[in-house]
């Protein structure tokens, strides 16, 4: 038993030798003592070893069908996009796990098979699930995930964010574990906003358009980038973090408004016009056209050929109709209606949306043109006063939201606890 001094009663840690006065806690075992500092150190060592061995083996990598089914649990519709993403993600991480990077040391230079990275371009209107698809994939695979807005980026040397800041977000998402970040997923949104202003190269410098595309080329393709840990160029003497982007999967998304007209010119299809009667049909035809997109269409839109070449897989998502929005509100595992019902349940109150109320929320989102992204804002508006009042009242058992509440601003129906008790006992 570890003691200090002749016949002294002061105990000390059997590992670091610190006395019980020098540490916060000393835990006793059979003839041995360990202090809280040594326990923390042991935990750090174990966590480090576990994280090093936590990489998914090829056998554990979910198959495309499993990835598709997982996406189905969270994302409504967009079947073709989900299938394309499932295959692309499976092939990407299969390549990572098998170490099939260019010039692998396992074979001679003549035998090596170079498996190129398949980054993904997702095209479709806002609020249709482009970002959410990428987020859900990252959650399933338990890899770091970061979102960047292309409109905030400028090429190096100009006011704005450097493209390296995208990598910094991923490193931060991985708790500064660079090795973990090197197998993460980055979603770059609004990529259509950095399209070249004209199809022909401009004499003037396009620092937020073509310049950004040029700056993104290397990190998307795969390079060792130097990332400033504090971001930006404000700290010139900071040490840079080195990160290899070879195994980072880039998912790039954008609405690409007007791209359907470019595709239409190529395939020789005539537009229907924009009268009220044919608008719905015209929208459906526009979605069909987006599914036929080719690299040359994207070049005409304003993406440079080198950038398009780094995004070999193109998936399109379609505009959500009322039925799809109703499903989004009610069906997924973490559907919005279920989320708000859970919030009310925590206050001991039952929340009920009538079927026509849910349809009204979907109609409202369609009118605003916000897609699925605007659903939460509408529900927040509808429930604001109730969420303000109900927690302070202990007499409310149930809140019922009807179509009139959503469309006309009528107050939701509040059912007192006594009425609910009588109904159950009857």
Curated annotation (Swiss-Prot):
Amino acids binding Zn(2+): 13, 16, 35, 38
GO BP, one annotated term: cell division
SUPFAM superfamilies for this protein: Glucocorticoid receptor-like (DNA-binding domain), P-loop containing nucleoside triphosphate hydrolases
Top-level taxon in the UniProt lineage: Bacteria
PROSITE patterns, per database record: CLPX_ZB
Annotated ATP binding sites: 125-132
GO CC term, one of those recorded: HslUV protease complex
Xref: HAMAP family: ClpX (MF_00175)
NCBIfam families: clpX, PRK05342.1
Protein name as it appears in the record: ATP-dependent Clp protease ATP-binding subunit ClpX
Organism: Nocardioides sp. (strain ATCC BAA-499 / JS614)
Gene this chain is encoded by: clpX
